[in-house]
C-alpha cells in the first residue's frame, strides 16, 4: 500500500513538473504544444479570441494584439507567433508579464511568465519593414493542465 501511494505521489509530481509555469521553452517554437503528461489538445473551437487594433497595417507598423477569453473564460498560459506560412515573422514587444522567445528570429514569439489565471493579455507586435503579405497569428492557449488548444489560427492581418 505504501509503495502504491508513493508511486501515485511521484507520478503526480512528475506530471506537474512537465508543465511550463513560466512560459513555453524555445524547443516548443515549431509545434507550439505543451505536451502535458496524460492529456491531449482539445479539438473543438477554443473559447478565446485574437483581435488586432487594425486589420490592415503598413510594413514596419506596430499594432496591439489582444488574446481574450469569451465570457468569464480564463487561461493560465499562451504562446503566440505571427506567421507567413510556417515561418514566424515580426517582433513582439516586451513587458513584465510576457516572455519573448527567439524562434528563427528575434523576439518573434510571445508566451506567459506565470501560470496565474487571466482572462486577457495585451501584446504589441511590429511587422517587418520589408514584408507585404497576409499574416496569420498562430496561438496556443492553456486553460489548465489537461485543457488546452494548440496552434489555432487568428483572423488574417494584411500588411501592405
Please tell me what each predicted stretch does.
Residues 1-160:
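Long, disordered, Ser/Thr/Pro-rich
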